[in-house]
């Protein structure tokens, strides 16, 4: 279930029996002015999802410049980045695009912020 990163949407997903939610990261990716506040909102939402027993994914607009901070959120289990990877693959090939993204995600998950994974 694709939702906004807030407690009310997560609670509504739980109420209808959803096992997994995907937090919308578009605002974080496209609003450089409000990016820090949006990151805090995503972190809080992911933590709330974990506290109520729902698996948390994230996606929309993620690219090489925005993925690391989202990947470092300990309670996010999966990222959806297909659109960017396919577009980027036009320039460097799909294996290279995936490899670069994987390196960024792996580095973020082993950083102090993502060390709880």
Segments (PLM) and residue ranges:
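C-terminal helical cap(s) of enzyme catalytic domains, especially alpha/beta-barrels
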Residues: 87-113
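Electropositive phosphate-/nucleotide-binding environments in soluble metabolic enzymes
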Residues: 7, 39, 64, 91-95
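Glycine-rich phosphate-binding active-site loops on the catalytic face of alpha/beta enzymes
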Residues: 20-31, 74-94
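Contiguous, function-dense segments enriched for cysteine-driven chemistry
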Residues: 53, 65, 110-117
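Catalytic cores of alpha/beta
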Residues: 6-16, 58, 62-76
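Alpha-helix-loop-beta-strand connector modules within alpha/beta enzyme cores
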Residues: 36-58, 101-109
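Active-site beta-loop-alpha junctions enriched in small/polar residues
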Residues: 2-6, 26-28, 54-55, 59-65, ...
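Histidine/lysine/aspartate-rich catalytic loop segments that bind and position anionic ligands
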Residues: 1-49
């Amino acid at each position: 279930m694709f939702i906004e990163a807030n407690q009310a949407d997560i609670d509504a997903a739980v109420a209808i029996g959803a096992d997994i939610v995907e937090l919308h990261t578009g605002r974080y990716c496209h609003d450089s002015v409000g990016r820090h506040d949006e990151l805090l909102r995503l972190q809080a939402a992911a933590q709330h999802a974990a506290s109520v027993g729902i698996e948390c994914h994230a996606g929309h607009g993620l690219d090489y410049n925005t993925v690391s901070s989202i990947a470092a959120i300990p309670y996010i289990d999966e990222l959806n980045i297909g659109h960017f990877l396919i577009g980027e693959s036009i320039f460097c090939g799909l294996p290279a695009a995936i490899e670069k993204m994987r390196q960024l995600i792996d580095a973020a998950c082993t950083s102090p912020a993502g060390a709880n994974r």
